[in-house]
C-alpha cells in the first residue's frame, strides 16, 4: 500500500519544489520568526507576507519516538520506524523521520537533512551527522 500523499497547494508549493531539488526551505516573517509548515501569516505576530529561506540542512534532534504499531496500513511493513522532532539550525522545528543510526540516537545529537523519496514525493528526513557517529 502506498503512503498517504501530501496535498500540494499554492501556499506550500515552494517547500515541495525545494525538496524536489534536494534542499529544505522554511518561511520567515519580517519580525524575525521562522516556521514550518507553511501558513499565510506569521504564527508569532500574525503579519502576512512571509518570505521563503533556504535551510542549511543542519539541525538538532530534540526528541523521538519509535512506533511499533502501524496506525495506517501503509506503515505496516516499515515497523518499527522512528519519528523525531528536529530543530533546524535556523530555528524552525519539524516532525520528520530519522533514517539511520537508530541505535545511537541521543537527545541534542546533530542531524543532517537527507531528502528521501516515496515514489515521486520528496520527503525531508534526517540522519545523524558524521560528528555524532
Question: Where do the language-model regions lie?
Answer:
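The −1 position to Zn-ligating cysteines in a subset of zinc-ribbon hairpins
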Residues: 25-30, 41
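Cys/His-coordinated zinc-binding microdomains
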Residues: 30-33, 46
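Short functional micro-motifs and their immediate structural scaffolds
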Residues: 36-37, 49-51
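Conserved hydrophobic positions within beta-strands
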Residues: 59-62, 98
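Beta-strand/loop nucleic-acid-binding surfaces
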Residues: 92-102
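OB-fold/S1-family single-stranded nucleic acid-binding modules
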Residues: 114-133
